[in-house]
């Protein structure tokens, strides 16, 4: 439809596949692949050394018509290629050479092992992490810091809402129980007032966690008394099948995502939102925890009193959570992002078809919100430099958007479309 907001412009089956497959973000090794210290595999070709690559699936694209009456067709513009590496390991968790120092920082140093590397006839030694180093990073960072920390934020407590990169005073999980927190992250009473009074400082005393664990075990071991054909009464397990349904919902929307994302250190923002589904699944067990407590009380108090007491007592858990989190989850009167974007747009001249160049999400989205939602300064053309290297975004820049005329780009589409002019010789004689 060529709307002003048209990310990746999925207009045919191939571009739609790339869009849904998030191919613009690249790939990461999951089961077998390189380490951050691995060297590319080399091979000799015609007496020279070249990188050894694997040619993958073809990339199709709608062929650009030279004339309007030319028939629609698709062409292969390139093949996906994967570089081969000389050093590989199973289940690679430390694979990004851009984060080498961060990997070592998280592990407090890496033992590593020296392995030989044939550099086209010249044998050199390369230090790569061991499998144990790799597994330690998986547990310390990817599981503990990038999943269980977020999980405990929701069901035990949160230190503050300042983004953490492993610091002891930023963004950790706590309980609100002093001696436990002292063991986890040190004496919290020694923190400066701005951290102690941070609105994101929420303590639940692990009550939601405990209630959820009660529900988990109650569901898994729930039985039902039945009478066999020969008149014998037995306890038949009825909860375990239901337990596995909730468990796999919990696993597939939480830990399985951790395995798939294979995240690197120094993430640009907290990623708790990626695992919200598993937190919802655990909330099912919290609800079942109330039923488990009620059933336990029934043997002592009777059915109705047990249900009332269990409900009233357990109601204090969500009340405690609301009392702690309302102030930092209340989104009313929060206009920083809106005002940020509006201030940017307000400073742009009103005459001469203005263009504002941005770089990255945080610069761009507040501007888009103001234009798309509030209709503010739709005469300004927002041009994201991060996208400008793609053909679909150049197409958008060449079209009118609201009150902003097309950007005066004079190239024909054949000159910048994918598969054409991807390497431009500035010195042909070289």
Residue ranges and their predicted role:
Residues 1-275, 281-353, 358, 364-430:
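ER/secretory pathway lumenal C-terminal domains and tails of membrane proteins involved
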């Amino acid at each position: 439809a060529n709307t002003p907001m048209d990310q990746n412009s999925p207009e045919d089956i191939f571009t739609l596949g790339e869009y849904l497959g998030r191919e613009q973000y690249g790939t990461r090794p999951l089961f077998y692949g390189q380490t951050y210290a691995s060297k590319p595999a080399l091979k000799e070709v015609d007496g020279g050394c070249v990188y050894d690559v694997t040619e993958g699936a073809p990339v199709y694209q709608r062929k650009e018509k030279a004339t309007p009456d030319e028939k629609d067709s698709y062409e292969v513009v390139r093949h996906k290629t994967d570089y081969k590496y000389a050093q590989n390991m199973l289940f690679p968790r430390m694979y990004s050479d851009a984060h080498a120092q961060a990997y070592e920082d998280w592990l407090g140093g890496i033992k590593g092992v020296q392995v030989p590397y044939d550099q086209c006839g010249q044998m050199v030694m390369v230090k790569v992490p061991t499998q144990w180093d790799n597994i330690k990073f998986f547990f310390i960072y990817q599981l503990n810091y990038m999943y269980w920390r977020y999980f405990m934020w929701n069901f035990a407590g949160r230190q503050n809402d300042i983004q953490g990169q492993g610091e002891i005073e930023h963004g950790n999980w706590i309980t609100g129980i002093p001696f436990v927190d002292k063991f986890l992250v040190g004496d919290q009473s020694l923190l400066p007032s701005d951290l102690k009074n941070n609105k994101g400082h929420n303590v639940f005393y692990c009550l939601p966690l405990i209630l959820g664990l009660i529900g988990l075990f109650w569901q898994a071991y729930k039985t039902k008394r039945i009478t066999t054909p020969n008149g014998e009464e037995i306890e038949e397990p009825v909860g375990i099948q239901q337990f596995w349904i909730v468990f796999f919902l919990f696993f597939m929307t939480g830990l399985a995502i951790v395995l798939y994302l294979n995240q690197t250190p120094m993430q640009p923002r907290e990623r708790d939102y990626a695992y919200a589904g598993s937190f919802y699944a655990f909330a099912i067990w919290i609800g079942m925890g109330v039923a488990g407590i009620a059933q336990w009380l029934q043997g002592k108090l009777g059915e109705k009193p047990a249900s009332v007491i269990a409900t009233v007592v357990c109601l204090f858990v969500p009340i405690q959570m609301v009392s702690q989190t309302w102030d930092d989850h209340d989104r009313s009167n929060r206009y920083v992002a809106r005002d940020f974007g509006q201030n940017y747009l307000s400073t742009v001249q009103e005459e001469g078809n203005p263009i504002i160049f941005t770089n990255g999400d945080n610069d761009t989205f507040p501007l888009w919100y103001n234009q798309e939602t509030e209709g503010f300064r739709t005469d300004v053309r927002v041009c994201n430099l991060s996208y400008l290297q793609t053909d679909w975004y150049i197409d958008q820049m060449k079209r009118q958007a609201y009150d902003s005329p097309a950007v005066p780009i004079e190239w024909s589409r054949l000159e910048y479309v994918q598969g054409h002019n991807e390497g431009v010789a500035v010195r042909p004689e070289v």
